[in-house]
Swiss-Prot record:
Family listed: Belongs to the cytochrome b family.
Natural source organism: Trinomys albispinus (White-spined Atlantic spiny rat)
Transmembrane segments: 33-53, 77-98, 113-133, 178-198, 226-246, 288-308, 320-340, 347-367
Needed cofactors: heme b
Protein name as it appears in the record: Cytochrome b
GO molecular function, one term: ubiquinol-cytochrome-c reductase activity
Amino acid sequence: MTNIRKSHPLIKIINHSFIDLPTPSNISAWWNFGSLLGVCLTLQIITGLFLAMHYTADTMTAFSSVTHICRDVNYGWMIRYAHANGASMFFILLYFHIGRGIYYGSYTFMETWNIGVILLFLVMATAFMGYVLPWGQMSFWGATVITNLLSAIPYIGPTLVEWIWGGFSVDKATLTRFFAFHFILPFIITAMVMIHLLFLHETGSNNPSGLNSDSDKIPFHPYYTIKDILGLLLMLLVLLMLILFSPDLLGDPDNYTPANPLNTPPHIKPEWYFLFAYAILRSIPNKLGGVLALAFSILILMLFPTLHTSKQRSMSFRPMSQCLLWILVANLIILTWIGGQPVEYPFITIGQLASMSYFCIILILMPMMSFMENKFLKW
């Protein structure tokens, strides 16, 4: 008789995805982030569901409902901070996951990669709308500034912004629809994750060498399940330290002041994980130009398969390209720092230089370096 996990229609799918899945024998800890992101998404949906039970999406009561969750609900403070810091954790893992994909050339799986970029957009949209819900000062002004960017779109811009707001400013209608979208998007993300995995399992995983590993595969369980559990424990350790010791470390103090349309905070800035894109947006003096640069700073990821000029897939044996990638990482850290600084000298100049080098490294220097390395292979 066949094993139930191989014959049952539902269990069979799980078996092919997580148990008997043939996996390269040499994948490193950098391949842990996918499963960690899955756990993170699950945690966010669960904590979000419990928060939604007590939250009210109304401008008059939103702020006080969040206060009520933290003060009066059993372990409400923990659920709230787990959700807020879980989002930060999500983005940390997401950026590591994308970085791994760039380093090891995983972007050559075109469908998987492009769905991943769409997933990044969806997660960013969800996080942005979630940040608006507590209805603090930074929630309100962040929503005002970011939605206002759409007014830069020629002809339809201003109408589009008013349509999104549901009025002539960010108000009750905006908060209600943002809550609705914030609730539904994680489920759309979950569906997209399944498609992401479907396409990944069509080709099989990449590995650090970038070579075909069909001749050397091992079952996913128990080898990688146990390896993923180690990663999970480390992630939970970091997350719990954040939640229990310094829950407000990554937040903005301004968001503890209720939203006031008559009082603008001195520095309007998004959450830390959007600061690099915010710095790119601010580095261009023209509104439409800034919006295009902001969109392209993420969309540029879709160009990686096209810009790949190297004869080797992975960067494991390409020290010059490695060097460039680490310069890009340093550049992104500088952009993140600049995004949180006021718009004044010298930060404006640093931001403009960092934004320019971000696009130069990806569009010009990396393909050129790969081309040069191909030449060195012939020596």
